Amino acid sequence: MSTNLRKTHPLAKIINSSFIDLPSPSNISAWWNFGSLLGACLILQTITGIFLAMHYSPDISLAFSSVAHITRDVQYGWLIRNMHANGASLFFMCIYLHIGRGIYYGSYLYKETWNTGTTLLLLMMATAFVGYVLPWGQMSFWGATVITNLLSAVPYIGNTLVQWIWGGFSVDNATLTRFFTFHFLLPFTIMGLTMVHLLFLHETGSNNPTGLNSNTDKIPFHPYFSYKDLLGLILMLAFLLTLTLFSPNLLGDPDNFTPANPLSTPPHIKPEWYFLFAYXILRSIPNKLGGVLALMLSILVLFMMPILHTSKQRTAQFRPLTQILFWLLIANLLVLTWIGGQPVENPFITIGQMASILHFSILLILMPIAGAIENKMLT
């Protein structure tokens, strides 16, 4: 009897134990599809990004026109560029749904997997930010100026830090060059950390909607979940292509069709939609340092999720109070996203402040209390 090469070859057996014979819970729903979709997004973004880098010039006198050249003169350049830009939006849609699933079903109790995942989110945000600067349009330039300027709020070393990042006394050629370097480098760091994320996940196996131990009922990943993931992938690509081919500039900013001009500030400086919730939290605090800390904490609060879990049950599936708070959190994040795109005037300022307070209250205070109350209700 010959042994199966898939199970003996040093490389093949790693792939086999990760994607073929991997024991998976039989009851994981479509909410567990987003991990593979994020992997697909990463591959797509890397491929389109490399092709764009072949034609892009990271110099302030050439950047804007090189992007115009890509969309006009390069074979399918318009498609590659629009897929890359909208692929970033899709990437964030998937990661936000993936994190939402993690919070709802208590996946954060796999601490190592959760912490590597949160670090991946931070790296992704950094990559998207430096990437947005590269076309060197008005919003690219002013977005870079405003966000890097936030570091000047750091006590004592703030101004030095900002000038160090800029490579001069303003956002200039040196800034664009280093941002291009980071935008090229970070995705490969993300790939490496993704492998660590998977390694930690496969130490414990997947969680499932009930939150109960699923060791008694496991099925092989292939063919069951490989085909389920394939369906998700087809739907995601259909959505991406529809967005790219019918409305490629829907999520972009019209100001970015104007070349960067340090002498003219756009009336409303705002980031891409996927950063608006954090931007609204930043703006809702009148103090600069306070705003920067709140901005950081709005993401870093995810690292605290495992510590703040008080319930005897893992998932929110059978916890009505936590369910109410979870959906309130989602609604509140949508409100913050809307506020982030509005001008700084009443009533938007007040709404933003209320929503910011609620964001932290739900995660840090109300959810742990709800967990404790639900424990009492069980006894």
Curated annotation (Swiss-Prot):
Gene3D superfamilies: Cytochrome Bc1 Complex, Chain C. Heme b b562 binds at residues 84, 183. Its cofactor is heme b. GO terms for biological process: mitochondrial electron transport, ubiquinol to cytochrome c. It is a multi-pass membrane protein. It holds the Pfam family Cytochrome_B. SUPFAM superfamilies: a domain/subunit of cytochrome bc1 complex (Ubiquinol-cytochrome c reductase) (SSF81648), Transmembrane di-heme cytochromes (SSF81342). Binds 2 heme b groups non-covalently. Coiled coil: none annotated. One of its GO terms (molecular function) is metal ion binding. It comes from the Eukaryota. A ubiquinone binds at residue 202. One of its GO terms (cellular component) is respiratory chain complex III. It is found in: Mitochondrion inner membrane. Heme b b566 binds at residues 98, 197. InterPro entries: Cyt_b/b6_C, Cyt_b/b6_C_sf, Cyt_b/b6_N, Cytb/b6-like_sf, Cytochrome_b, Cytochrome_b_C_euk/bac, Cytochrome_b_N_euk/bac, Di-haem_cyt_TM. Its main location: mitochondrion. The chain crosses the membrane at residues 34-54, 78-99, 114-134, 179-199, 227-247, 289-309, 321-341, 348-368. Keywords: Electron transport, Heme, Iron, Membrane, Metal-binding, Mitochondrion, Mitochondrion inner membrane, Respiratory chain, Transmembrane, Transmembrane helix, Transport, Ubiquinone. Component of the ubiquinol-cytochrome c reductase complex (complex III or cytochrome b-c1 complex) that is part of the mitochondrial respiratory chain. The b-c1 complex mediates electron transfer from ubiquinol to cytochrome c. Contributes to the generation of a proton gradient across the mitochondrial membrane that is then used for ATP synthesis. The cytochrome bc1 complex contains 3 respiratory subunits (MT-CYB, CYC1 and UQCRFS1), 2 core proteins (UQCRC1 and UQCRC2) and probably 6 low-molecular weight proteins. Belongs to the cytochrome b family. Heme 1 (or BL or b562) is low-potential and absorbs at about 562 nm, and heme 2 (or BH or b566) is high-potential and absorbs at about 566 nm. This is Cytochrome b.
